[in-house]
Amino acid sequence: MLMRFYEENIPLEMKAKKQWVCYRKRLIDGKVKKVMINPCNMSFAKSNDPSSWSTFLTAMKVLRNPKYKMDGLAYVLANDYVFI
């Protein structure tokens, strides 16, 4: 089930960055984990590989499309992170 969040509360500075992924919750070793998915090609995303990240708009389109069965959206922190 998709958790409710308020898109308007996400800072524009974050929305402008191409650092977004979707995730699916999976039971791994008895614990629920968030598995990051590249919204552009549905492959696994990597926290250390910017080529596997996407724009906010692309990630939102995938999140809202029930055929992809995503559980949420995640912002990947990069070396240039300056938000407080």
Short names for language-model regions:
Residues 1-84:
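Conserved phosphate/metal-binding and DNA-contacting active-site motifs used
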